[in-house]
Amino acid sequence: MTDVTLKALAAERQVSVDRLVQQFADAGIRKSADDSVSAQEKQTLLAHLNREAVSGPDKLTLQRKTRSTLNIPGTGGKSKSVQIEVRKKRTFVKRDPQEAERLAAEEQAQREAEEQARREAEEQAKREAQQKAEREAAEQAKREAAEKAKREAAEKDKVSNQQTDDMTKTAQAEKARRENEAAELKRKAEEEARRKLEEEARRVAEEARRMAEENKWTATPEPVEDTSDYHVTTSQHARQAEDENDREVEGGRGRGRNAKAARPAKKGKHAESKADREEARAAVRCGKGGKRKGSSLQQGFQKPAQAVNRDVVIGETITVGELANKMAVKGSQVIKAMMKLGAMATINQVIDQETAQLVAEEMGHKVILRRENELEEAVMSDRDTGAAAEPRAPVVTIMGHVDHGKTSLLDYIRSTKVASGEAGGITQHIGAYHVETDNGMITFLDTPGHAAFTSMRARGAQATDIVVLVVAADDGVMPQTIEAIQHAKAAGVPVVVAVNKIDKPEADPDRVKNELSQYGILPEEWGGESQFVHVSAKAGTGIDELLDAILLQAEVLELKAVRKGMASGAVIESFLDKGRGPVATVLVREGTLHKGDIVLCGFEYGRVRAMRNELGQEVLEAGPSIPVEILGLSGVPAAGDEVTVVRDEKKAREVALYRQGKFREVKLARQQKSKLENMFANMTEGEVHEVNIVLKADVQGSVEAISDSLLKLSTDEVKVKIIGSGVGGITETDATLAAASNAILVGFNVRADASARKVIESESLDLRYYSVIYNLIDEVKAAMSGMLSPELKQQIIGLAEVRDVFKSPKFGAIAGCMVTEGTIKRHNPIRVLRDNVVIYEGELESLRRFKDDVNEVRNGMECGIGVKNYNDVRVGDMIEVFEIIEIQRTIA
């Protein structure tokens, strides 16, 4: 038999190549798909397969089903049958031969050990029995010797005992008499105590019966069956169960017309409740008729004479209704007390802790202030961060005006192309990168320079150690440059100035120094504290000097952080990835963040399922000053939130939920504060046009920046209203919300999914995609400008002087005029001026030249003008003709 390849053998046997390779491996032969198979190896495989076929099944499963019928009594005496099937399943697993041998050997060894222990126990019992017999024999001999000695002594003392017998008998009789007297006294005392207890019990029972009779109706009560003889030790529920059984036994004999009488009594109510209700109704009826006044309710409970002072526990916020419940008073009383203190409130209004404390103490209650963030503080304090601090890399934020070359500068340092890949060549996210240099590691944060990203720049300044202020040498100090200086000063971080674009012919670095000195940034050569470095991101000049300046500044700051222990840091950016879920870019400040750690991040929590660096590579841990992307949070955190590693996921969840609830309460409390200055704004609210927008963006920072920019566009006439905003693609929910609120759907670097597109098409919604924030803001401005009411402007088109006035039977006074300027048109409004003062404003009724009606009369011609509803025209008056022009306004 010739050798064949394994692939051919698989085709011949009609099995897959992988299956055949696995069978060879089970037989102890390693083969790949292209290896040849000899006849000997085929025989070995065949023998292995035969052995497997001969061996019986390893597992046996027995299933058993039993069916039964259960009758369930239903309403109206009918019963319902329910089929019940019980399934039982048992699986017997055949043991491996080697395992069976091992277990048999273990059982044999155990049996031998038990037999050996039994033999040893028998021998021990024999020894103990022998020793016991010996001890008993010795004791018997001792007892016999003692009895013999006693008999001899008794014989000797017999004579003397006879003499003392009489005296002993007398003493014993006296002792018995005293014992009998003591027993008689004790019996009498017990009878007296029992009698007193019985009298006390009778007195208590009589008093209870009397109070019960006083609290009942004055009408004759129904006789109550006395069950005290057999219900002494049973509870109320046991008595009800016994009575129920008795009724069922008695009622079972004659089911029929009287079957309803055997119904069980209602739980939780007295047996007489129905009779009481009937009597109450009868009493009301008699009271109305005025015939029977005998049935009246007597209340035995007396109202407490003095107020009850309670301990009231108050959290950080509480509603007026909850405060009233805790003090056990009506809500109206609390509202009255607040009005006395000068605060107007409703029962559902949320009030703060101080106000609630004042009100409760005013009403005479003791206040206990509850610190609701105790759990949060406990979770934060339970962290092992006691290790010694070590030097860490500086966190450097690149700031400056838009298009001044921040990303290009960082791009050259990292030797990558980031700027060309960003929309419009401008940065719209915070980018976090760490760079290894010859002198150490530096972490860079690249912030946007556009005016819309103020909050993002402020966040970058707070998380940083050093700010590198990039200023273009040909452009000088610009608005965002000034804002970046203010952020750096507010954060209290040193500034290193990088004068960029130094290779341009129109570059003027001295002008940059002069302009920056006006804002407190003085170069070192002028006696200041800021280092100025001339760089060119395009040519690469001055980059090494800039890095040296950064490291020198970091050395002066002596930056240190704890490297070991549980990590803490800040969220630089966050977004929702469709495949990976919420993703947060975290800058670690201290400790080491490991994969699998439980993190608490603002309102969100979770376990770190994966960590990636800025290059997209998986990492297992991140130390201080290292930026990483983490996956596994419960939701998208807000940019700028603190990230803390905690021990217990359950406690982290509780803290996150507490923060969400607290944020909601504070938000509601803030909304309900009615301010006087908003009153007039609310009155004119209906006259203001609104541009409703549903905004979705790729990252949290962009949502925040765009929302702030759009809200700043609002004017007194047109307001921008962000109906909904979020991170991630446009969903069907967003489209439905936009349709309900008549809003524009705006997607910034995101797209709508299939279900959302269907809703958008069916509802004909306005959907707009943007990748550059300039275009978004410009188009929203244009939409708002279209809603502005146009500006009306009056333009004078003609002026006529009245030379003579004559009467017309049809129009009254007619002014004979000479057109001195422009053109007089028939259907335009006019003003009559006398001594340059407007005395009438109206319209022309007739315009004639000679006897013909004309539409217009030009400059230098005479005409007759009839003014509608005005006859007091005099010689020398001026008639001014004007037209109203609508000018479309725009938002600056």
From Swiss-Prot:
Q: Where is this region: G4?
A: 500-503
Q: Which cell locations does it reside in?
A: Cytoplasm
- Tell me the residue numbers annotated for binding GTP: 400-407, 446-450, 500-503
- Quick one: where's region G3? 446-449
Quick one: where's region G1? 400-407
Among Pfam families, the record links this protein to:
EF-G_D2, GTP_EFTU, GTP_EFTU_D2, IF-2, IF2_assoc, IF2_N
The protein's GO terms of the molecular function aspect are: GTP binding; GTPase activity; guanosine tetraphosphate binding; translation initiation factor activity
According to the entry, every stretch annotated as the tr-type G domain falls at 391-560
In this chain, the stretch annotated as G5 covers 536-538
Similarity-based family: Belongs to the TRAFAC class translation factor GTPase superfamily. Classic translation factor GTPase family. IF-2 subfamily.
Q: Which PANTHER family match?
A: TR-TYPE G DOMAIN-CONTAINING PROTEIN, TRANSLATION INITIATION FACTOR IF-2-RELATED
This chain belongs to the protein called Translation initiation factor IF-2
